[in-house]
């Protein structure tokens, strides 16, 4: 018998995003690039600002399943810079996904949006971010993405 898989909420990343740039149909779907403009990180024992660079690189598959790969960084209030590489998928009813693409509001509970963030930092206070696996439950809004990050125990 293996250990029970459990998670614990640790913090929320709110990333402000810019306008979508499309590279068009690439044979496997439509490639989109969405700049990350800034934001905040808030949680128990960690808080800071999302730095104003990086992007979310997406492929929208023909069935509207969206594969995401975001690369960016945040700086904690005590000066640690943390690099983030976050991969995931977003899926739901086609019409609701199209509403999201148009910037229209959609109830996040009806869209499956999960991620696997990975963190890197040399700061001793945050080495634990590189010693565990994390998963995220996310919501897309017109001007931001909100990710609740959970540590896999």
Swiss-Prot record:
HAMAP family hit by this protein: UPF0311
Family listed: Belongs to the UPF0311 family.
Name assigned to this protein: UPF0311 protein RPA1785
InterPro entries: UPF0311
Organism: Rhodopseudomonas palustris (strain ATCC BAA-98 / CGA009)
């Amino acid at each position: 018998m293996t250990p029970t898989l459990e998670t614990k909420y640790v913090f929320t990343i709110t990333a402000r995003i810019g306008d979508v740039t499309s590279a068009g149909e690439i044979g496997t779907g439509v490639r989109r690039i969405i700049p990350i403009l800034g934001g905040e990180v808030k949680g128990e024992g960690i808080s800071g600002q999302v730095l104003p660079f990086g992007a979310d690189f997406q492929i929208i598959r023909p069935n509207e399943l969206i594969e995401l790969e975001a690369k960016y960084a945040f700086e904690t209030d005590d000066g640690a810079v943390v690099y983030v590489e976050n991969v995931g998928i977003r899926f739901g009813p086609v019409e609701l996904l199209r509403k999201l693409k148009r910037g229209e509001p959609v109830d996040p509970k009806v869209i499956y949006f999960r991620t696997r963030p990975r963190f890197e930092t040399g700061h001793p206070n945050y080495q634990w971010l590189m010693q565990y696996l994390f998963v995220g439950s996310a919501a897309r809004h017109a001007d931001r993405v909100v990710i609740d990050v959970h540590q896999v125990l």
